[in-house]
Regions:
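Assembly/oligomerization interface modules of large self-assembling protein complexes
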Residues: 19-110
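Structured core elements
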Residues: 111-113, 201-203, 291-293
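Short, solvent-exposed amphipathic alpha-helical segments in soluble enzyme
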Residues: 129, 217-221, 308-310
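Intrinsically disordered, low-complexity terminal tails
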Residues: 1-35, 316
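Alpha-helical scaffold segments that mediate packing/assembly in large oligomeric complexes
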Residues: 110-191, 314-316
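Short helix/loop capping segments that flank catalytic or ligand/cofactor-binding pockets
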Residues: 79-84, 95, 121-123, 211-213, ...
Length: 316
């Protein structure tokens, strides 16, 4: 059965459809929970496919209750291990102290109104089209919220007036050479090793990606754009907005502020979400209409800012 078939059955008060509505609303926490209704899995997969930035971060499930949630962070870590000088000597002492932070849980959703005539007498594809539009709008809204949070956090870390978290580039973006980039990546790898985080990918704004693609050696482009072969230092999929640079995955961050470049460990930012975003509200018997809504709950927070290593280019 399709989503349109489900909506028609739900409008008739079909017991199985009503039960499925409650299961969708309360129990589904991921896209793979063994649910036997194929269209539900398809809905969640379509939502994930349209969230390019959200998908590079860590995901977790929201708690059952609460308008805000707390999460633990490491405040200080003085632990260390050294060689014991001689038998019986005290080992090196250290301790970890923890703190808590809180983040608000926000609601994202929208609805559409359809007449009972459309629900009961139209062909299923017409209903599916309306539902698909809501799914896509939900994906766009939640993806935009995650992008805004990530981009703001990167800029805040890089441009902080006190103890900024950044790597200083040796040149302006326009003047960065392949050697400059290679050194920058090595510096980032060394810093990531010190912080015990992963150098998973380099996230960049559109202008930075264009600058990377424009790198040349005696007129020959460094990047393979055709996909027909491997070039010297990397390749880039112009439609998938992702590629590799010196074996490091590169992801374009759509609509990020100009000059944005940041090495990103997925565990640096966590996205908490509720279950499958589907719910049918009550109809209006005086107008013979039904309101179909899509909604979900989401929270976003920086759970390990050490996993973000922003790049600061020299001013032009």
């Amino acid at each position: 059965r399709t989503a349109g078939d489900y909506l028609q059955a739900l409008s008739r008060g079909d017991e199985a459809a009503v039960q499925l509505m409650h299961e969708c609303r309360d129990l589904i926490a991921t896209g793979d929970t063994g649910n036997t209704s194929a269209w539900i899995a398809d809905d969640l997969r379509l939502i994930e496919m349209r969230r390019k930035v959200t998908n590079i971060l860590t995901h977790d499930t929201l708690p059952d209750k609460g308008m805000t949630m707390e999460y633990n962070v490491v405040s200080t870590d003085t632990t260390g291990v050294t060689k014991q000088a001689k038998e019986g000597d005290a080992l090196k002492f250290g301790k970890v102290t923890f703190g808590t932070k809180s983040v608000s849980i926000d609601t994202y959703g929208g609805y559409t109104t359809m007449s009972r005539q459309v629900i009961e007498r139209s062909t299923t594809p017409m209903l599916n089209t309306a539902l698909a539009a809501l799914r896509n709008a939900y994906a766009k809204a939640t993806e935009t919220a995650v992008r805004d949070y990530l981009y703001t956090t990167i800029a805040g870390q890089r441009d902080a007036t006190s103890n900024p978290n950044k790597l200083d580039a040796p040149a302006t973006l326009a003047n960065m050479t392949i050697d400059n980039w290679a050194t920058l990546i090595m510096d980032a790898a060394e810093l990531a090793d010190d912080r015990n985080v992963n150098l998973t990918r380099l996230g960049v704004s559109k202008d930075v990606m264009a600058s990377l693609i424009d790198l040349k050696d005696s007129g020959s482009r460094f990047f393979d754009l055709s996909g027909d072969g491997s070039d010297t230092i990397g390749d880039f999929d112009l439609t998938g907005i992702a590629g590799k640079f010196l074996r490091l995955p590169v992801q374009m961050l759509p609509k990020a502020p100009a000059g944005t470049a940041c090495f990103i460990d997925p565990e640096s930012v966590t996205v908490w979400e509720s279950g499958g975003p589907t719910q049918l509200s009550d109809g209006d018997p005086t107008k013979l209409t039904e309101n179909y809504s899509v909604y979900g709950y989401m929270a976003v927070a920086a759970t390990n800012v050490d996993g973000l290593i922003p790049v600061k280019f020299k001013a032009a």
